[in-house]
């Protein structure tokens, strides 16, 4: 029984969803980050503004879970994955003929752009682990889209 058959052939609907999604990601990445680093927007934050070592941040959060409140821990681990699941669904909806490998490259470039702008503007922390977690989220989104397409929930 197909209760959720969605006809998303209208590119307009997908474009609006993507624009809303990008706005949300930019808000979380730049405006929302000030709640994690008080004073950042005033230019007085003096903490580390980058991590170029793969798995350093992930390891810190996973092996020192007791040192962080749940919100901080969740945002910096699972939140980074969850944030990018929608783009893994939306790109194939907008560009159905695009190969999955190219979709992953677009997701990687989107994440790298956000992290680079955070580094340059100092409105966040450039973290290679965020790029890895974001890419994992995008990949999960691609897999979800593929599953839903096979089940014919998307036309």
Explain the meaning of each model-derived region.
Residues 125-145:
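Alpha-helical transmembrane segments that form the membrane-embedded catalytic/substrate-binding core
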């Amino acid at each position: 029984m197909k209760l959720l058959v969605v006809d998303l052939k209208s590119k307009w609907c997908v474009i609006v969803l993507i624009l809303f999604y990008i706005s949300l990601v930019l808000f979380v990445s730049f405006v929302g980050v000030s709640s994690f680093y008080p004073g950042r927007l005033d230019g007085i934050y003096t903490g580390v503004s980058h991590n170029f070592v793969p798995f350093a941040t992930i390891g810190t959060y996973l092996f020192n879970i007791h040192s962080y409140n749940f919100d901080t821990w969740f945002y910096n681990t699972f939140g980074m994955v969850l944030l990018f699941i929608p783009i893994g669904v939306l790109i194939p909806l907008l560009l159905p003929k695009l190969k999955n490998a190219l979709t992953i490259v677009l997701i990687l470039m989107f994440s790298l752009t956000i992290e680079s702008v955070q580094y340059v503007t100092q409105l966040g922390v450039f973290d290679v682990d965020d790029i890895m977690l974001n890419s994992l989220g995008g990949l999960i989104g691609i897999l979800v889209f593929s599953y839903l397409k096979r089940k014919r929930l998307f036309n």
